[in-house]
């Protein structure tokens, strides 16, 4: 099947129920005939899509923010960061992609601006991207974890410092990835 049809088929149950939705790209998404920009256009053509291509000057496609509004006063009550963790590393590095320095700087700018707009307090934030951070391995290997791990954490061989930036930003309560399946 062509990539556009696959996207439409995957999202169809959500669209049929008229549920607002958003997505981040995975490392396999643009391995076919369509680029990430093309796939973003497919996403945005579907009903109730909240995905955005994001700033043109940032690495990747699909770096965007979804603000969650308070029902009482329309103030931003929480925030979702969606980031493109790329596909694969450069040939010299090998392995999987990572959040790039310009994306990290963008996140920190956005976190600082949101904190300032919220009276100096951070908003509660969740971050979504595809490829896990190297720190996922460290947590599993060095700390008490519950659950099952039936394969290795497939993270980049390079640590871009995004986890440290999340700590510096002080707003992200959790990160969610989909790479290991």
Predicted features, each with a name:
Residues 16, 79-81, 93-181:
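His/acidic metal-ligating clusters that form di-metal
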Residues 5-120:
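Extended active-site neighborhood of metal-dependent phosphoesterases/phosphodiesterases
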Residues 2, 8, 168:
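Functionally engaged cysteine thiol sites
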Residues 1, 27-28, 85-86, 131, ...:
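Active-site metal-binding loops of divalent metal-dependent hydrolases
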Residues 1, 22-24, 125-129:
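Short beta-strand segments at enzyme active-site cores
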């Amino acid at each position: 099947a062509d990539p556009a049809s696959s996207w439409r088929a995957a999202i169809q149950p959500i669209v049929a129920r008229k549920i607002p939705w958003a997505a981040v790209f995975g490392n396999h998404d643009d391995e076919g005939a369509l680029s990430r920009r093309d796939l973003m256009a497919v996403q945005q053509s579907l009903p109730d899509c909240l995905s955005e291509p994001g700033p043109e000057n940032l690495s990747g496609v699909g770096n965007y923010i979804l603000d969650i509004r308070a029902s009482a006063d329309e103030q931003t009550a929480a925030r979702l960061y969606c980031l493109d963790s790329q596909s694969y590393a450069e040939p010299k590095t090998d392995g999987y992609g990572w959040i790039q320095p310009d994306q990290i700087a963008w996140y920190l700018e956005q976190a600082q601006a949101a904190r300032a707009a919220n009276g100096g307090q951070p908003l509660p934030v969740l971050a979504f991207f595809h490829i896990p951070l190297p720190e996922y391995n460290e947590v599993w290997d060095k700390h008490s974890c519950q659950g099952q791990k039936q394969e290795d954490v497939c993270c980049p061989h390079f640590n871009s410092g995004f986890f440290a930036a999340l700590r510096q930003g002080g707003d992200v309560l959790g990160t969610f990835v989909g790479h290991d399946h």
